[in-house]
Amino acid sequence: MSSDVSPPPLLSAEAAAQLATAPPVFTTDQILEILPHRYPFLLVDRVVEYQPGQRAVGLKNVTFNEPFFQGHFPNRPIMPGVLIVEAMAQLGGIVLTKLPDVAGRLALFAGIDGVRFRRPVLPGDQLLLSANLLTIRQKRIGKMFCRAQVGGQLVTEGELMFSLVD
């Protein structure tokens, strides 16, 4: 990580399982009020942990009915890595746009650093997403450390940058 902030530890399979059944902090309907994304591009089903101005943990249930599985790949469906990154970015967007100083602004992707893919995401997997705010500058640029896990196993992690626009 290029920041001085250490990434949080990976969640154990047991902790991930507990979060999978935790009551939502933000439901799908509430997420729709926060994010501009809509089906088929809304990639956060619910937020199960939220610390204002710091971090969020969310879930994406990956089903065989996802539109991207039709072509990625026939007879061997794998969730595209760019959509895993997008899911992490959407969760990061929730953390940023809920900040009092930036309420009502739109968080746009501005950069990706150090993203690595560790294992494929398959139909039936539940992505456990985490987004941790590292920095925000001039109420215009935010940097997050984001991670995706399945069953306690690391799938993807990296730093995402956002530009906040009116």
UniProtKB/Swiss-Prot annotation:
Xref: InterPro entries: FabA_FabZ, FabZ, HotDog_dom_sf
Keywords: Cytoplasm, Lipid A biosynthesis, Lipid biosynthesis, Lipid metabolism, Lyase
EC supergroup of this enzyme: lyase
GO MF assignments: (3R)-hydroxyacyl-[acyl-carrier-protein] dehydratase activity
UniProt-annotated catalytic positions: 72
Presence of the UniProt keyword Hydrolase in the record: no
Compartments where found: Cytoplasm
The reaction(s) this protein catalyses: a (3R)-hydroxyacyl-[ACP] = a (2E)-enoyl-[ACP] + H2O
Protein family membership: Belongs to the thioester dehydratase family. FabZ subfamily.
Name of the featured protein: 3-hydroxyacyl-[acyl-carrier-protein] dehydratase FabZ
GN (gene name): fabZ
